[in-house]
Structure formats: C-alpha cells, structure tokens
A protein has these predicted regions:
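Acidic, polar-rich low-complexity tracts and alpha-helical solenoid repeat scaffolds
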Residues: 1-218
Length: 218
C-alpha cells in the first residue's frame, strides 16, 4: 500500500484532472493506513457523479469524518450514501450509521432518529444491526413516555421484533391507564383488551391490563 500511495499521490499531484477511480483507490489506501485527513482530501474529489463509486466514497468519507471527530460532516456523508441505491449493502451500513448520528446529535424525544430507525427496520428487517436498532427504539419509546407517538411508530414497522412487541404491550397498558385516569372508560377497556390480546410478550403488562380492565367495567 505504501508503494501504491507513493505512485498515486505523485500522479494525482502532477495531473490537473486525475481519474476519479485513481483518486478513490488513493483515498481507500489512505483510509487503510489510518490517514483520515488525506482520505477526505482524496475522496471528496470523487463524488461529482451519481454512481456506485460515489456511494462507496461517501461511506468511507463518513467513517473518516467520524475518526476525525467531525460528526456533522460524517452525518451528511452517511446520508448521501444511504440515499443512493447502487449497492444495497453500502446503503444498509450508511443508513445505520446515519441513524445513530442523528440519534446522538439531535436527540429530542420523538425526532428524526425514530423515523429513520423505522425506515431502517422496514428496509432491512434481517440486518445484522436490527437488534441494536430495536434496542434504540425501545429506549426512546419508554424513556420519552410519549406513548401515543410510540404506538404510532410501532404500527409503522412491518415486522416488529419481540422487543418491540414487548414494549407495545406496555405502551398499550400505559395508554389504558391514562384513559382510565381521564374517565374515558370505553377507551381504557379497548386499550387494555389490545394489551391482553398481544399475548405473553410482557406478562406484567398483560396481568395489569386484566386487572385494570376489570376495574374499568365498574
């Protein structure tokens, strides 16, 4: 790789319009050597066209910016790679990293990250990252206590995981208790019944729903 870097960097510096493919290879060589500033310098010159090379370059750019501590540019690079569809594996990795950065840098309860996590699970239900995304979503659902928004979010997921369904059962129960407290007893019965009908994902929520549904009938 040292030899490749020497040859390519000499070519790039002596040529007015170096080939994008050569800039890309040079950038990847720099990345593999851990020279992230030079990676950015090389690869940022390759993203002039909408093609597979650009999508790959944006993924490397995102990872390089992360290594350099520049989360804002990393987020934009991952977003660019995630919105391109030439390579689905690149799209998957980029979308996951983009969602994480949105979650870390702009977390305001029910924000953009939840929508991106939903989209990720619908686009890549069998992803190696699916479990982590489910964990992040459940964390947001239960810590923000915005149960109505959480239920709407869960209902958008085509193939919810066991963790998501466990959270859904608790959310239905919590919404039922809110309805009960507001003397909306028909709504409370409906919500408690939905929690019960989900089955045994969350036995505590199910048992509590049975009890409070009985109270709601009186």
């Amino acid at each position: 790789q040292e030899k490749a870097i020497r040859m390519l960097s000499k070519y790039v510096s002596s040529t007015e319009n170096p080939l994008r493919s050569d800039l890309y290879i040079l950038g990847v060589c720099y990345f593999n050597k851990g020279n992230y500033s030079n990676t950015v310098n090389a690869l940022s010159r390759t993203v002039r066209q909408n093609d597979e090379l650009t999508q790959n370059a944006y993924l490397y750019l995102g990872q390089s910016y992360l290594k350099l501590g520049d989360k804002n540019n990393a987020r934009m690079a991952f977003e660019a790679a995630a919105t391109s569809s030439f390579d689905k594996q690149i799209k998957e990795v980029a979308m996951y990293n983009y969602a994480l950065l949105i979650h870390e840098t702009a977390f305001t309860g029910f924000g953009e990250s939840v929508t991106i996590f939903e989209d990720f699970l619908n686009d890549f239900p069998n992803s190696q990252y699916a479990d982590k995304v489910n964990d992040y979503l459940v964390e947001v659902y239960l810590t923000t206590k915005n149960y109505e928004a959480a239920l709407k979010s869960i209902n958008k997921i085509k193939h919810p995981s066991t963790k998501i369904l466990e959270a859904k059962q608790d959310i239905l129960f919590q919404l039922g208790t809110q309805a009960f407290a507001n003397v909306k007893l028909d709504d409370a019965v409906s919500l408690f019944s939905q929690a019960i009908q989900l089955g045994s994902y969350n036995m505590e929520a199910r048992n509590d729903a049975y009890f409070w549904r009985g109270e709601s009938y009186y």
